[in-house]
Each structure stands twice: as C-alpha cells, then as structure tokens.
Amino acid sequence: MDMLPAKADNAFRQVERGEALIYVPTIVLAECVYLAEKGRISLRYDELFSRLRVAGNFVVVPLTLEVVEEIIRVPLRELHDRIIVATARLLGAILITKDEEIRASSIVETLWE
C-alpha cells in the first residue's frame, strides 16, 4: 500500500498474500464514513463494503458487550480509540495505528514505523 511506513505496509502485504488477518472494528468503518462525509478522505462506500464482504482476510468485528466492558480498562481520551484498543486487546491482536497516544500508552502492541 502506498504512503504507509514499511512495517505497516508489510502487514497489509501479508494479508494480501493470505498470510495474515486484519480485524476491522465497526467503529473504524464508521470513522471512515464520517471522514468521507467531512471531505477529509476519499472513499467509495460501495467498493469498500463489497470488498469487506468477500475478503476472507479482513474480518469485521462488531461492537459487543465484551468490548464495552473492556473499554472501562482503557485509559485513553477518545471513545473511538478506546473501542479500537479494547477490541485489539480482546482479540490479542497487534494494532496497526499511527495514533501517537495509543502507541505511547503500550496498552496493546502496535505496529506502524
């Protein structure tokens, strides 16, 4: 993928080769819609959603009661970040993020640069 640091780019390439999974919390999709509506990113909803429906290597993770319970133990400022981190923690997943607060928190293992 273009414009990503090497480690993040490599993670996406592993997924493309079928060597790994990427979990996508539903809040991330909601954020994408919001940012597109505000004109901050370019996004084709139909293409994104259809690709996610057929891609076995991208797993959409719903907001569940377990995630909400885990949010209580995530001391970050932004609710959406807390949801994302709580989801990663419950899944035991490495979080691909450039968010400095999340990376500095060491709540979950992160990957970016």
Which role does the model predict for each range below?
Residues 1-24, 37-51, 105, 111-113:
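Short, well-structured N-terminal submotif of metal-dependent ribonuclease cores
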Residues 28-29, 67, 84, 101-102:
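Alpha-helix capping/helix-boundary segments
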Residues 21, 59, 94:
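Residue-level detector of anion-binding/catalytic polar loops
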Residues 55, 85-113:
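Acidic, PIN/NYN-like endoribonuclease modules and their adjacent C-terminal/linker elements
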Residues 32:
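Phosphate/NTP-binding elements of NTP-utilizing enzymes
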Residues 49-74:
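Acidic catalytic patch
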